[in-house]
UniProtKB/Swiss-Prot annotation:
Gene3D superfamilies named among the record's database cross-references: 6.10.250.620, Radical SAM ThiC family, central domain
Name the record gives this protein: Phosphomethylpyrimidine synthase
Upper classification of the organism: Bacteria, Pseudomonadati, Pseudomonadota, Gammaproteobacteria, Candidatus Palibaumannia
Cofactor: [4Fe-4S] cluster
Gene Ontology BP annotations: thiamine biosynthetic process; thiamine diphosphate biosynthetic process
Family affiliation: Belongs to the ThiC family.
Disordered: region residues: 109-130
Keyword set, alphabetical order: 4Fe-4S, Iron, Iron-sulfur, Lyase, Metal-binding, S-adenosyl-L-methionine, Thiamine biosynthesis, Zinc
Binding, Zn(2+): H432, H496
Residues that coordinate or bind [4Fe-4S] cluster: C576, C579, C584
Length: 622
């Protein structure tokens, strides 16, 4: 498409994205925060965290003295973009963090780089790499699962252990370490996550570390039931809208707002080029659905798809560095007929493509037929498989039907095959499921898929709220995360309506970070409650700035507060506009606490209540 034929609104969006890329620098971004690094035993292991600095607590009304509040370290997915000391240049990409570890293992070798041959001749579109991709040396297996089964603790595992503990050893306050036990439905909770624990979980197949050796820019992370619940963000262009600049902007924006992984679901023009820009600039693992690009190669004609074209696409993406593939190998021909009576049929793009191909050719799904070959390729690059739920329900009416669970059983069979090749596996799940039917999805997945990590889209709990499906799905996501789901795929406000923009990405991520964190609290994940306790303490002490800064979205929290009390004095007030100065429950509760401390009262009695007259309360307001 020529630039002159692009609608004006699209040109503006693209220009804004280009300006964002050109001006991008490492930045702490969030107020009163700084980048810190946790040092591992291995000298090259430095784990990034964001540390939120807090204000001291005023003890006494007239400022008799202050008590310090320790800074709160939080998990940070922003990579180099969150470090103001790092120079960012999206045209050269990020630092190749894991390359030193990959080379030290001496079990992979460079291969000729033909990726540049696939790039557009337009220099504005192409990202020219100056390195050769690698693959496993002959006879070697290089997956994190292989290392874990061999008893090897890799630097990636050490990195992850530090990251999952979230720097909580830096906090000495007993108040902040208070936590409810939670209920984890039989999960294996560790009070302190060690590199050995990470190794054991990966070896058992209960967790995966997506880490293609050709994406050394990514920072190690783990997806598993016994770790923090993760969130994936989907980006990617379509045949109708978006550009490379906008997708790179969305990538950076997504990692800033907490995306643990990102999937590039591009289906429009320049799929290869878009993916290269994303990979070279991504500090988080990148997933794809390869069938989309394979279909583009046959000009969208499904019956022209074949195994050779698909395998060529896998190889191309493997050499670029894709960390996990969604493969719809469980959509068997006999299961397709089970969807005929559904209200909404097959709603997965990949699932519908393979279903149509099977029916047109009257043949079994070629992804299923060639699954062992897919595994061999993945083992040579350490690409994880995300076994797609091509028959997931697209409406609450179709939830938990025979087609859905038949496919799930097949995904369990494929999981065992992948493990024979030491390939890491996770299982994708629904979809649209009403609340009372969600738990079965988790229990059946654990049973039939041998506790491989579960990765779900929501699920959406009702179908009546287009424009608010980040809410309808966030409810289901929190619940299934509590039951044991390892990663939640976000849903944006644009779900069912259109391609999400930058702001939609943020809204979807905030909703899903809330859901994931709520699940971690419910499971009793060690250290999950520290930030909540810090927020509650700041709220009770009317430290408004700290309340804003501890929030998932400090900017929105501050904006809402300042809509009614914008003055600087409002940040020092012992009330907000909801209750005002006379009816603030926390202000009154604080007076009661101060009074009991002043009078050394240990228990509440009728005589104590009688003492709480106006003069007593006023004197206690110190």
């Amino acid at each position: 498409m020529s630039r002159s034929s692009i609608p004006a609104s699209r040109r503006v969006s693209r220009a804004k994205a280009q300006a964002f890329m050109d001006s991008l620098t490492g930045s702490s971004y969030f107020p009163n925060s700084r980048r810190i690094y946790l040092q591992g035993k291995t000298p090259s292991v430095h784990v990034p965290m964001r540390e939120i600095k807090l204000h001291p607590t005023l003890i006494g009304k007239n400022g008799e003295h202050y008590e310090d509040n320790q800074p709160i370290p939080v998990y940070d997915t922003s990579g180099p973009y969150g470090d103001p000391t790092i120079a960012i240049n999206v045209r050269t990409g990020l630092n190749r963090l894991r390359e030193i570890w990959i080379l030290a293992r001496q079990d992979s070798e460079p291969i000729s780089n033909n990726n540049n041959d696939r790039q557009s001749s337009d220099k504005q579109l192409s990202f020219t790499t100056n390195y050769n991709p690698r693959r496993a040396s002959y006879g070697r297996c290089i997956t994190q699962l292989h290392y874990a089964r061999a008893g090897i603790i890799t630097p990636e595992m050490e990195f992850i252990a530090l990251r999952e503990n979230m720097g909580r050893e830096r906090i000495s306050s007993n108040v902040l370490h208070q936590q409810h036990l939670g209920s984890n439905f039989g999960a294996k909770k560790a009070d302190h996550i060690t590199a050995e624990f990470v190794r054991q979980e990966v070896a058992a197949g209960r967790a995966i570390i997506p880490s293609n050796i050709n994406h050394p820019e990514s920072e190690p992370m783990i997806i598993g039931r016994n770790f923090l619940v993760k969130v994936n963000a989907n980006i990617g262009n379509s045949a109708v809208t978006s550009s490379i600049e906008e997708e790179v902007e969305k990538l950076v924006w997504a990692t800033r707002w907490g995306a643990d992984t990102v999937m590039d679901l591009s289906t429009g023009s320049y799929i290869h080029e878009t993916r290269e820009w994303i990979l070279r600039n991504s500090p988080v693992p990148i997933g794809t659905v390869p069938i989309y690009q394979a279909l583009e190669k046959v000009n969208g004609v499904i019956e022209n798809l074949n195994w050779d074209i698909f395998y060529e696409t896998l190889l191309e993406q493997a050499n670029q560095g894709v960390d996990y593939f969604t493969i719809h190998a469980g959509v068997l021909k006999r299961y397709v007929l089970l969807t005929a009576s559904r209200l909404t049929g097959i709603v997965s793009r990949g699932g519908s493509i393979m279903a149509q191909w099977s029916l047109v050719h009257n043949q079994e799904n070629f992804l299923y037929e060639h699954f062992s070959e897919i595994c061999k390729l993945c083992a040579a690059y350490d690409i994880a498989l995300s076994l797609g739920d091509g028959l997931r329900p697209g409406s609450v009416q179709d939830a938990n039907d025979e087609a859905q669970f038949s496919e799930l059983h097949t995904l369990g069979e494929l999981t065992k095959i992948a493990w024979e090749y030491d390939v890491q596996v996770m299982i994708e799940g629904p979809g649209h499921i009403p609340l009372h039917m969600i738990e079965r999805n988790m229990t059946d997945q654990l049973k039939y898929c041998h506790e491989a990590p579960f990765y779900t889209l929501g699920p959406l709990t009702t179908d009546i709220a287009p424009g608010y499906d980040h809410f309808t799905s966030g409810i289901g996501a929190a619940l299934i995360g509590w039951f044991g789901c390892a990663m939640l795929c976000y849903v944006t406000p644009k779900e069912h309506l259109g391609l999400p923009n930058k702001e939609d990405v943020k809204q979807g991520l905030i909703a899903y970070k809330i859901a994931a964190h709520a699940a971690d609290l419910a499971k009793g994940h060690p250290g999950a409650q520290i930030r909540d306790n810090a927020m509650s303490k700041a709220r009770f002490e009317f430290r408004w700035e700290d309340q804003f800064n501890l929030a998932l979205d400090p900017f929105t929290a501050r904006m809402y507060h300042d809509e009614t009390i914008p003055q600087t004095a409002g940040k020092l007030a012992n009330f907000c506009s909801m209750c005002g100065p006379k009816f603030c429950s926390m202000k009154l509760s604080k007076k009661i606490r101060n009074y009991t401390n002043m009078k050394n009262i240990k228990t509440i009695s009728n005589s104590f209540m009688n003492k709480l007259d106006n003069s007593g309360i006023k004197n206690a307001d110190r």
